[in-house]
Amino acid sequence: MIILSTNDNLTNPYEIARYIKEAKKSTPVRAYIQGNIEIEETEELEVYGCDNFKIVFGELEVVEKLLEINKDKIKHYRLEYDRRNSAIPLLDIKHLDARIEPGAIIRDKVKIGKNAVIMMGAVINIGAEIGENSMIDMNAVIGARGIIGKNVHVGAGAVIAGVLEPPSSVPVVLEDNVLVGANAVILEGVRVGHGAVVAAGSVVTEDVPPNTVVAGVPAKIVKIVDDKTREKTKLMEDLRG
């Protein structure tokens, strides 16, 4: 199994792809088993329960073998699983100093800054970084190695392209205080400058200068950020912390 260390260059799409290809694939399952069966806990099986009822955690092939061997002793069983041949585990979020809502999918090797907010249905891929006080809204996607600065809002359904497929050595970067509207798309390698605003539904194909507003398909500069724009796009601190 290939382990991607903290020293590996996650901006290299081919290194990430190699890691995914060579990683041991996992299909973890949870089995609820009713029957007169003795199950010994091993390195491959985690077992809970009493005489006639067991809850077993393990890889699919190991648990299925257990069920087949003991099929004459089992009255009922139920298998639950949520992935198949998964190459990258999900991030351990329990000690993050951030708000992670149910249904967010965050893969391993992701960095989440203090007081960040990850909403329901958001997807954050391997190697991405989310800065302090930034919000990734519902159903937004942050691709592999996407770099999100501090005090950024990525609107619902927005897509921040990753460095994988098509491969790109340069990640998307949203600098501090950027706002990306709902359903906007930021394509591979684009850098959005400090304080810029990307209008909802825009497709950004080129770098965005700081403190500008871009809109359209493809996105073009429509104005400079002014006091009225700042008022309309300001973040709500009560949603953070």
Swiss-Prot record:
GO terms for molecular function: tetrahydrodipicolinate N-acetyltransferase activity. Disulfide bonds: none annotated. Pfam families: DapH_N, Hexapep, Hexapep_2. Its EC number is 2.3.1.89. Signal peptide: none annotated. It catalyses: (S)-2,3,4,5-tetrahydrodipicolinate + acetyl-CoA + H2O = L-2-acetamido-6-oxoheptanedioate + CoA. Pathway: Amino-acid biosynthesis; L-lysine biosynthesis via DAP pathway; LL-2,6-diaminopimelate from (S)-tetrahydrodipicolinate (acetylase route): step 1/3. InterPro entries: DapH, DapH_N, Hexapep, Hexapep_transf_CS, Trans_hexapeptide_repeat, Trimer_LpxA-like_sf. It is an enzyme of class 2 (transferase). It comes from the Bacteria. GO terms for biological process: diaminopimelate biosynthetic process; lysine biosynthetic process via diaminopimelate. Keywords: Acyltransferase, Amino-acid biosynthesis, Diaminopimelate biosynthesis, Lysine biosynthesis, Repeat, Transferase. Catalyzes the transfer of an acetyl group from acetyl-CoA to tetrahydrodipicolinate. Belongs to the transferase hexapeptide repeat family. DapH subfamily. This is 2,3,4,5-tetrahydropyridine-2,6-dicarboxylate N-acetyltransferase. It comes from Thermoanaerobacter pseudethanolicus (strain ATCC 33223 / 39E) (Clostridium thermohydrosulfuricum). The gene is dapH.
